[in-house]
Amino acid sequence: MTDFSKILDKARELEAKMKESQEKIKQIEVVGSSGGDAVKVTLNGDGEMTNIHLSEEILKEEKGIIQDLITAAHNNAKSQLKSKTSEEISKA
């Protein structure tokens, strides 16, 4: 086998691993929370918000507090997603 053939084989192998990682990343789901779990935000592997949960107690709070808690929960989920995505890519 020539050096060029070895390089091509390695490239194909790496491409297959990256595609596999991308598929696994799409399956990731993370839940970020804030306010002692009063607010929970779920993100999928593409970073899209798929769910938001607000406890009954939190709905009694002022609008600004609720907005801050939603933002914090989203940022928490985004941080988790970034970590899990990096972890998955490093396996490739």
Provide a role label for each language-model segment.
Residues M1-V31, S79-A92:
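Long amphipathic alpha-helical segments used for membrane anchoring, targeting, substrate engagement
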Residues T2-S5, K26, S55, L59-K60, ...:
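Generic, ordered loop/turn and secondary-structure boundary motif
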Residues A11, G47, I70:
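Residue-level signature of catalytic and energy-coupling elements of molecular machines
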Residues V31-I52, I58-E61:
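N-terminal intrinsically disordered, cationic/polar leader segments
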Residues S33, I58, Q67-L69, K84:
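Short, charged/polar low-complexity linear motifs in solvent-exposed/disordered segments
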Residues G36, T71, S86-I89:
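Juxtamembrane/interface motifs at transmembrane-helix termini
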Residues E62, I66-L81:
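Short, well-ordered alpha-helical segments
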